[in-house]
Amino acid sequence: MPGRERRDGGRSADKNDNNKGRNDRGRNDRNNRRGRGRDDDRNQYIERVVTINRVSKVVKGGRRFSFTALVIVGDGQGMVGVGYGKAKEVPAAIQKGAEEARKNFFRVPMIAGTITHPVQGEAAAGIVMLRPAAPGTGVIAGGATRPVLECAGIQDVLSKSLGSDNAINVVHATVDALKQLVRPEEVAARRGKSVEEVTPTRMLRARAGQGA
């Protein structure tokens, strides 16, 4: 009869089917939770694809094509990273670039939405100059510099590209400039002065209003 044990100690088919169904549902629930966790981590970051290129490799049988993607990822609150992905398909290249960008995260010092002091970054032939700006100025930047600044959460800044227009060089020059930024406390400690002596009055007022 259904639901009863057989004399040889085995269980009837309907019980085995029920147990299998419960196990499958449990595995599916766990997989769904893992998938939601990955989606939540991905959604909390800002992603910008700067450039996608098709590259080829000459092999014995002909040419093999693949794609490269330069991706910027940031949380919009001071954390930003740059990644370069390569794959046979565009979505896979973008995903690899985003994963590498998360591994390369670094913190950008800011005061009231702008950078702490003027700075110039260089990478190969790319040269990018950044200057602090008053509230309401916005991000005055173009080309490949803008997505880096926006992903970092910088709201007011002046920038100028002085070298190569190559997107990869410009992005890495911008990153080099941002990595050179230091907080006023670090400058004061290095010079043996107070924070008020090394920080412009406008930034001190903005910092006081920010509650930093």
From Swiss-Prot:
One of its GO terms (molecular function) is structural constituent of ribosome. Pfam families: Ribosomal_S5, Ribosomal_S5_C. One of its GO terms (biological process) is translation. The keyword Cytoplasm does not apply. GO terms for cellular component: small ribosomal subunit. Residues 1-42 are annotated as: Disordered. Keywords: Ribonucleoprotein, Ribosomal protein, RNA-binding, rRNA-binding. PANTHER family: MITOCHONDRIAL RIBOSOMAL PROTEIN S5. This is Small ribosomal subunit protein uS5. It comes from Corynebacterium kroppenstedtii (strain DSM 44385 / JCM 11950 / CIP 105744 / CCUG 35717). The lineage of its organism: Bacteria, Bacillati, Actinomycetota, Actinomycetes, Mycobacteriales.
